Amino acid sequence: MKKIIFATGNEHKMVEIRAILSDLGVEILSQKEAGIKADVVEDGSTFEENAMIKATEIAKIACQMPEYKDAVVLADDSGLEIDYLNKEPGIYSSRYMGEDTSYDIKNQALLDRLEGVPDEKRTARFVCAIAAAMPDGSCEVVRGTMEGIIGHEIVGENGFGYDPIFFLPEYGCTSAELAPDKKNELSHRGEGLKKIRKILEQK
């Protein structure tokens, strides 16, 4: 394994990924940087299924390219589960209210749906499933989670997505108020990447 391709065009994710996997001693590329153009339909019913679909489809393309035939392809599917809302938005987190809708609007809509709901019923978690499609055709998948509650207002500038409404009681702040290194330590994606890292270290 000399290269890792992460099947995303999300620059925020790439910053987190590189921070956690950088000392593996391999080149880490986004799908765009690898020159792979593909719009994979994620039609699975779980985070894990969607991550595996994306990783294996991009790996099929990568293995046809001489420079990436030995690359590992990683893909994630992540989202927010709010218990009071029957785990919505769940696997539809990025598509909630439409993919072109800003997260300021999405976050406010979720706060409005939870108006008057007490903190003990506002439990939620971020989930991140990460799949690793190996050059030998095998695929492994792991899950990372971060538990918290949905706050009462949009707070914080450091994160993205639903971070500004995801409150961590033990730290007294939202995920969007955490310093980047602390977020990598605590986050669902950080946990998933650390699990994948252990798998990759054995390859």
Feature names for model-found ranges:
Residues 2-5, 11-203:
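Anionic-ligand binding patches
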